Amino acid sequence: YKVTFTNDIFTPAEIGVYCQHVCHPENSKFSVILLHDLNQGHKPNIWEYEPWNKFDIGIVPGTFWTNLWSQCACQYYVNPRCGTYELGYPKSNLVSSSELAQCAHALRQKLNLKYDISILYAPSWENDGKEDDFIQALSSLKVNLLIKQANWSDVYDNITENIHQMRLLHEGKYDNVFYIEPEESIMTALAICDLVVSDESNVMAEALMFG
């Protein structure tokens, strides 16, 4: 099979693998569903909001999620047609990969970090000037402050405008504040930091994979 990655959730496929909150498995002859993230909301029964019964196979990342699935499996909408399997979390493969190590090295060189310790600010949603709170609280310390905003589409224009205004306010004003482009993989940003500040996103769970 030829493997294609796409942002178009309506793309027809022989085998479709989905991890979005909103999916369209009817466009695939055979469909596989994974969690969107490890911190997925609506626990313990996320399937009430994001049913799996329209998929052929479901994949959960570990024992915790297997137990959650088992507790809810009495409901028809929890059960994919061919079963649910505990197969791990795909992003964890990146943590020890040479590809990520190379990307992290390149990003460090690009940023030319000033200090040995780096604190990453990586929220899901930029609201209420929280980036400014982060910088004002920590900019006097001998640490690098890394800013990595999520790569939101223009549909969320209020959030993208908040991100834009925060960057205008801070970029170039501090010698220890470094901006990582929103398009950069969050895994690369996590690979070069020592501490993470985030909100309700999966970022914190993924940071734990780096030890």
Give the positions of each predicted feature.
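A donor-sugar binding/catalytic signature common to diverse glycosyltransferases
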Residues: 27-35, 183-211
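Short, surface-exposed amphipathic charged segments that create phosphate/polyanion-binding patches used
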Residues: 16-23, 31, 97-107, 160-162, ...
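Nucleotide-activated donor-binding/catalytic signature segment of Leloir-type glycosyltransferases, i.e.
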Residues: 160-182
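A generic structural motif
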Residues: 1-7, 141-145, 174-175
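Conserved catalytic-core segment of nucleotide-activated headgroup transferases in glycan assembly
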Residues: 80, 87-168
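Active-site and donor-binding regions of nucleotide-sugar-utilizing enzymes
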Residues: 1-99
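Phosphate- and divalent-cation-binding pockets in alpha/beta enzyme and binding domains
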Residues: 68-69, 130, 206
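Acidic, amphipathic alpha-helical patches
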Residues: 48, 134, 185-186
